[in-house]
Amino acid sequence: MDNFLALTLSGTTPRVTQGKGAGFRWRWLGHGLLELTPDAPVDRALILSAGIHGNETAPVEMLDKLLSALYSGSLTLTWRVLVVLGNPQALAAGIRYCHSDMNRMFGGRWQSFAESDETRRARELELSLETFFSSGQARVRWHLDLHTAIRGSHHLRFGVLPQRDRPWEADFLAWLGAAGLEALVFHQAPGGTFTHFSSEHFGALSCTLELGKALPFGQNDLTQFSVTSQALSALLSGVETSTSFSPPLRYRVVSQITRHSDKFALYMDAQTLNFTAFAKGTLLAEEGDKRVTVTHDVEYVLFPNSSVACGLRAGLMLERLP
């Protein structure tokens, strides 16, 4: 299965759907779904996902190279892994999504969207994770969902972690730093993301990794992702990652800006970078007689987007943690 990406983009079913690699077994589970199981018993399970948004291609190319290294035997596998290319149709078309944003649909939220390829795919991915985690006895469960951002950022690489009732494990946060993340953002409320679903329903240590700028296939400079790629290689092979990195800055979400109607106005332009700071009292958005202002001494914006559909998030406001 050394042509997983090509098969996914073409929508082709492989002639052979299971086989042996270098020290592991593989099974093709459906378009964009590949399970890898080491020959030796392991108690660690990992979801590696990319392409939930079809225009975010660099992480997909990165996973393709990791798979090639595994198949060639140059990389040893020490985890049970489910590789997920999230939205094959959008990836093939080179667009963010075909109908609706899948990363708002998980945890059953797809039921509140008009039926589409994305709602069906979200349901399929939920079932795939349920099957994957229930078929093993993993003591450790991780989910790394790889993305690139639409706009520029004061932190080139950062992670967004779902709301979690239990403390985050230190080795997981340390690995995120070793993977080159400059900042970590901690959600305080549930959401419809893929990582929130895996964390809430399966207890996985989950993170959405934002790794740079969204570009089409073939236009990515993968050397910009070398730190993350090396950390993933070390993780898969069970090698300790470097500790010679600056710990990521930490932020928590303090509020969400939501667009409810066509009267909505967001006072940030297309050049506003992620993690831009705003002082207390700054007017961020208006909608009719409702005004959204900064309530803390300093807040930082994440994912500002004035053109989202009504009812969706137009931005997150963050507070820096000590």
UniProtKB/Swiss-Prot annotation:
It comes from Salmonella typhi. One of its GO terms (molecular function) is zinc ion binding. Zn(2+) binds at H53, E56, H147. Pathway: Amino-acid degradation; L-arginine degradation via AST pathway; L-glutamate and succinate from L-arginine: step 5/5. The keyword Oxidoreductase does not apply. Its EC number is 3.5.1.96. Keywords: Arginine metabolism, Hydrolase, Metal-binding, Zinc. This is Succinylglutamate desuccinylase. It comes from the Bacteria. It is an enzyme of class 3 (hydrolase). The active site is at E210. One of its GO terms (biological process) is arginine catabolic process to glutamate. Binds 1 zinc ion per subunit.
